Amino acid sequence: MNSKSGYNRLFDPMAETGQALDFSQHGLGQKTVGNPFSAKAKMSVRNLNVYYDDKQAIHDVSLDINRNEVMAMIGPSGCGKSTFLRCLNRMNDTIENCSVNGEVTLDEQDIYHKKQDVVPLRARVGIVFQKPNPFPKSIYENVAYGPKVHGLVSRRAQLDEIVEDSLRKASLWDEVKDRLFSPGTGLSGGQQQRLCIARTIAVSPEVILMDEPCSALDPIATARIEELMAELSQNFTIAIVTHSMQQAARVSSRTAYFHMGRLIEVNDTRRVFTNPEHELTEAYITGRFG
C-alpha cells in the first residue's frame, strides 16, 4: 500500500490531507498486520483483553517489545494505547472496575501470576506519566526515595552515587548539582519531567514506560526529552505512547498503531509511515481521520 510519502508528510503542516473518511468499522476483524513478534523480546504480550466493567477497551492484542528499542504506540484518542501501556507494569490494578486477561511476560515470566509482587515489578518496569509529578521533596530526595524504599543502599555514599548517576543519565545533573536540596517542584516543566525520569532510573529498571511524556512541555523541553530517549535506549527498553506522529517518527525504531482497542499494525517505524499495510494505518498517518 502506497501512502504517498506519508513519512515526509508528517513534517509538512500544509500537506493536503484529503477527504475525511469513516473507517470506524473497517477491517477490525482482521489479524494485526506487519511484524508484531520478535526473537529479541524483552516483554511479550499474548491475547490481551482489558475491560472496564462490561466495556472492552483492549481486544485480543499480541505484541513483543524488543530489548533496548524504543517502541512507539500511536492512534486516535481513546484507541486503548495508554490502557495497553499500563498493563505492562500492572498500573491498571489500581483501577477498581478494570479487569485484565491474557498473558504479559517479562523475560518469559508471567507478570500477572498470582504470586507476582507488584512492588518489585514496578521497579523493574518503571513509568513516566504525561504530567510531571515530582514529590513535594528536594531534588535529591525525589531521586533517593526509590532506592531507599527498595533497600538498594546501605550507606549514604552509595545513595549519593545513585542520585548523581541518575541525574546524569537524565541529562539534569549539570543544571541542578548546586541546588540538590531545593524543592523539585521549583524546577521548570521540562526539568521536572527529567527529574521524574531520573527518579525512575534510580531503581535500575529494565523497562521504562512513557505515557505522553512531552504533551505538557514546550518544543525545547520536548527536544531534550527526545534526545534523552535515544540515549536511554542504550541501557533500557522503552515503550512510549504519543499523540504526535512526528515524535514517533523521530524517536522510535518500531511503531504500533492502535484503533478502537485493537492493534492494527506493527512494523519498523519508517515502514509504517512510508508503506503501511493496512488502510486504517494509512488513513491515520495521512490525516484522513483521527
Swiss-Prot record:
<dbReference type="InterPro" id="IPR017871">
    <property type="entry name" value="ABC_transporter-like_CS"/>
</dbReference>
<dbReference type="InterPro" id="IPR003593">
    <property type="entry name" value="AAA+_ATPase"/>
</dbReference>
<dbReference type="InterPro" id="IPR027417">
    <property type="entry name" value="P-loop_NTPase"/>
</dbReference>
<keyword id="KW-0067">ATP-binding</keyword>
<dbReference type="GO" id="GO:0035435">
    <property type="term" value="P:phosphate ion transmembrane transport"/>
</dbReference>
<keyword id="KW-0592">Phosphate transport</keyword>
<dbReference type="GO" id="GO:0005524">
    <property type="term" value="F:ATP binding"/>
</dbReference>
<keyword id="KW-0547">Nucleotide-binding</keyword>
<feature type="domain" description="ABC transporter">
    <location>
        <begin position="43"/>
        <end position="285"/>
    </location>
</feature>
<comment type="similarity">
    <text>Belongs to the ABC transporter superfamily. Phosphate importer (TC 3.A.1.7) family.</text>
</comment>
<dbReference type="GO" id="GO:0005886">
    <property type="term" value="C:plasma membrane"/>
</dbReference>
<dbReference type="GO" id="GO:0016887">
    <property type="term" value="F:ATP hydrolysis activity"/>
</dbReference>
<protein>
    <recommendedName>
        <fullName>Phosphate import ATP-binding protein PstB</fullName>
        <ecNumber>7.3.2.1</ecNumber>
    </recommendedName>
</protein>
<comment type="subunit">
    <text>The complex is composed of two ATP-binding proteins (PstB), two transmembrane proteins (PstC and PstA) and a solute-binding protein (PstS).</text>
</comment>
<dbReference type="InterPro" id="IPR005670">
    <property type="entry name" value="PstB-like"/>
</dbReference>
<keyword id="KW-0997">Cell inner membrane</keyword>
<dbReference type="InterPro" id="IPR003439">
    <property type="entry name" value="ABC_transporter-like_ATP-bd"/>
</dbReference>
<comment type="function">
    <text>Part of the ABC transporter complex PstSACB involved in phosphate import. Responsible for energy coupling to the transport system.</text>
</comment>
<keyword id="KW-0472">Membrane</keyword>
<keyword id="KW-1278">Translocase</keyword>
<feature type="binding site">
    <location>
        <begin position="75"/>
        <end position="82"/>
    </location>
    <ligand>
        <name>ATP</name>
    </ligand>
</feature>
<dbReference type="GO" id="GO:0015415">
    <property type="term" value="F:ATPase-coupled phosphate ion transmembrane transporter activity"/>
</dbReference>
<dbReference type="Pfam" id="PF00005">
    <property type="entry name" value="ABC_tran"/>
</dbReference>
<keyword id="KW-1003">Cell membrane</keyword>
<keyword id="KW-0813">Transport</keyword>
